[in-house]
A protein has these predicted regions:
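Structural beta-alpha unit
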Residues: 1, 24, 77-114, 151
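Small/aliphatic-rich secondary-structure junction motif
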Residues: 1-58
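Glycine-rich, Arg-bearing micro-motifs that act as flexible, cationic patches
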Residues: 4, 113-139
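General small-molecule cofactor/ligand-binding pocket signal
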Residues: 35-37, 90-94, 145
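Short secondary-structure boundary segments
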Residues: 38, 117-119, 148-149
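Short, hinge-like loop/turn segments at secondary-structure boundaries
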Residues: 52-55, 108-110, 132-134
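A short acidic, glycine-rich active-site loop
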Residues: 56-73
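Short, flexible loop segments at boundaries between secondary-structure elements
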Residues: 141-151
């Protein structure tokens, strides 16, 4: 059975290019699927809300519902595009830091590749800031395909 392709997707034009590439990869491997992953970190001030007794727990649940409501149409459009190309697609909204979330999903699903888009930052910018493709390339046990930004 083919291994799923894990796609990091945030709705940007860069992730749209990554979606196109993931669809092509999937079509080149009959039977493979795409797991479209949207990662979102909870705001730092709400991290205590993981404890149900924390006063911020309700605020975190409200925040999560708002984010889900906002990103659902975007994720639906992306999944519909992949499915229209004949690729079975699953959508996941993961509440975690993107690099950790994408690696976890890829390992749990037995994926052979993580596909992400690049916003065109060079290696220095990637090394200085939190740049998901750069971090994945240097830390992931799962191979990573970085799709360049298309102007």
């Amino acid at each position: 059975m083919p291994h799923p392709i894990v796609l990091g997707y945030d709705g940007s034009s860069c992730s749209a290019a990554a979606l196109d590439e993931a669809v092509e990869l999937s079509r080149d491997t009959p039977g493979s699927t795409i797991v479209l992953v949207y990662c979102h970190e909870p705001p730092p001030g709400l991290s205590c809300a993981l404890d149900p007794g924390c006063a911020a727990a309700k605020a975190l649940r409200d925040y999560e519902r708002r984010v889900e409501h906002e990103v659902e149409p975007m994720l639906h459009r992306a999944a519909t595009k992949a499915r229209a190309a004949g690729v079975e697609t699953e959508v996941l909204l993961v509440w975690d830091e993107p690099v950790r979330a994408l690696e976890d999903v890829a390992r749990k699903r037995g994926s052979r590749v993580i596909v992400v888009g690049s916003h065109g930052e060079g290696p220095i910018a990637g090394a200085l800031g939190r740049h998901t493709p750069f971090e994945l390339l240097h830390h992931s046990d799962v191979p990573v395909l970085v799709v360049p930004h298309r102007h």
